[in-house]
Amino acid sequence: MQLTAVGLNHQTAPLSIREKLAFAAACLPEAVRNLARSNAATEAVILSTCNRTELYCVGDSEEIIRWLADYHSLPIEEISPYLYTLGMQETVRHAFRVACGLDSMVLGEPQILGQIKDAVRVAQEQESMGKKLNALFQKTFSVAKEIRTDTAVGENSVSMASASVKLAEQIFPDIGDLNVLFIGAGEMIELVATYFAAKSPRLMTVANRTLARAQELCDKLGVNAEPCLLSDLPAILHEYDVVVSSTASQLPIVGKGMVERALKQRQSMPLFMLDLAVPRDIEAEVGDLNDAYLYTVDDMVNIVQSGKEARQKAAAAAETLVSEKVAEFVRQQQGRQSVPLIRALRDEGEKARKQVLENAMKQLAKGATAEEVLERLSIQLTNKLLHSPTQTLNKAGEEDKDLVHAVAQIYHLDK
C-alpha cells in the first residue's frame, strides 16, 4: 500500500456536498480509528474543515472512497465527481500546499496549519499513524514553518473572521449600534467575536449548549457580553441585528420558522445572518425571507480576496520552495525504502566472504602456501559476488534495458 490522499474542497465541491462529507469533531477519533483498521488503509489522518474534507492514508484509494461513502451512507456515484485522488508524490505536494495556505480560499491563511495539527494529534491518539504518515506530517510542519517565515504568502491576509465584520459593515453603518448574537463557542466563533468586540457593539451574546463555556468566552471578550443557552434562541432571536453561527451540530439549529417569527417581531428591520458552519447551522430556506440576509462560507469568497494580488506574488516563490521540498522528501523516502535491500545485499556479501575464508583456512591447514591460497580466495570471491548478476544479465539480454542500465550504473560501467 502506498501514500495517497482522497478528498474534496471549496474548489471541487459546493457547500451542499461538502457538508454531507464533513466529520464532526466528536466523531473524528472513532472515524479515523475505523479507517486505519479497515481494508482500505493501514494508516490514516482525517482533515475536516468548513472548506475541505481530506483523508491522508497509506492504502488503496478506491477502497478509501468506498469507505468514505459507506461512512456517510452516501452512494459512491453521488460523491465521486467531486473527489480528487492523489498518488504518492502528489499527496506530499498537496499536504505541503494545504499547510502553507496555498490551497486555501483565503490565500496564505494561518488557521489551516492549526487544523492540520489537530487532525494529526487525533490520529496519533487513536494510533492510526505509522512511519509513512508520521514522516509526511513532520516534514509538512517543517515546510509550512519555513515558507511562512521566508515568504510573504501570509501577509495582508483577510481572514474569515475579519471578513465577517466587513460584511456586516456593508449592511449596517455603525456596528456600535448593534446587538450581536454568536451561536457556538468554538475557535471560529471566538475569532469572529474578537473582531466584533473591537468595534464595541451595543450588546454581545454567546449562545452555547453549555452555559459555562458560553460564560468563559464572554469573560475572554472583556466587553458587554452575556451568555445564554441554545434553547433560549427562539425567545431572544428577534433582539439581535447580527447572528453569527458556527457549531459542530449535524443538524440545523436555526430554522426558517424561528427566523420568520423573529422578523415579525423586528417589524421589517434587517437581520444579518452569517453561517460559518459545515454542515450548516441555519436552514438554507432562511435566505428566501425578506429582510433576512443569510451568508455562508461560500459567499465569503469575494470579500476575502482583498490583498490577494500581493500574496499571489509571494505564492509563486512559495510554490518553488514547495517543489524543492517535495523532491527532497521523495528522495529521502526512496532512500529509506532501499535500506532492507542494502542490508540483504551486505548479508549476502558477508556470507560469501565467510565461505571463501573458511575454504582458505582449510587449504592453509593442509600446507598450501599463502600465495596459492590468496590467489584461489580472490578468484572464488570474485566468482561468488558476480555469479548472480552475471546470470541475471544473461537472461535479460536486450529485452530488459532498464535492468542492463541499472547494473551499468551500479558498477560504474556507463562512463
From Swiss-Prot:
GO biological process, one term: protoporphyrinogen IX biosynthetic process from glutamate
Stored Gene3D superfamilies: Glutamyl-tRNA reductase, N-terminal domain (3.30.460.30), NAD(P)-binding Rossmann-like Domain (3.40.50.720)
Pfam family, one: GlutR_dimer
Residues with site note (Important for activity): 94
Catalytic residues identified in the record: 50 (nucleophile)
Gene Ontology terms for molecular function: glutamyl-tRNA reductase activity; NADP binding
Matches recorded under InterPro entries: 4pyrrol_synth_GluRdtase (IPR000343), 4pyrrol_synth_GluRdtase_dimer (IPR015896), 4pyrrol_synth_GluRdtase_N (IPR015895), GluRdtase_CS (IPR018214), GluRdtase_dimer_dom_sf (IPR036453), GluRdtase_N_sf (IPR036343), NAD(P)-bd_dom_sf (IPR036291), Shikm_DH/Glu-tRNA_Rdtase (IPR006151)
Domain of life according to the entry: Bacteria
Keywords: NADP, Oxidoreductase, Porphyrin biosynthesis
The EC number(s) this enzyme carries: 1.2.1.70
Keyword Oxidoreductase recorded: yes
Binding site for NADP(+): 184-189
NCBIfam families with a match to the protein in the record: hemA
Purpose: Catalyzes the NADPH-dependent reduction of glutamyl-tRNA(Glu) to glutamate 1-semialdehyde (GSA).
Misc remark: During catalysis, the active site Cys acts as a nucleophile attacking the alpha-carbonyl group of tRNA-bound glutamate with the formation of a thioester intermediate between enzyme and glutamate, and the concomitant release of tRNA(Glu). The thioester intermediate is finally reduced by direct hydride transfer from NADPH, to form the product GSA.
Subunit organization: Homodimer.
Identification of the protein by name: Glutamyl-tRNA reductase
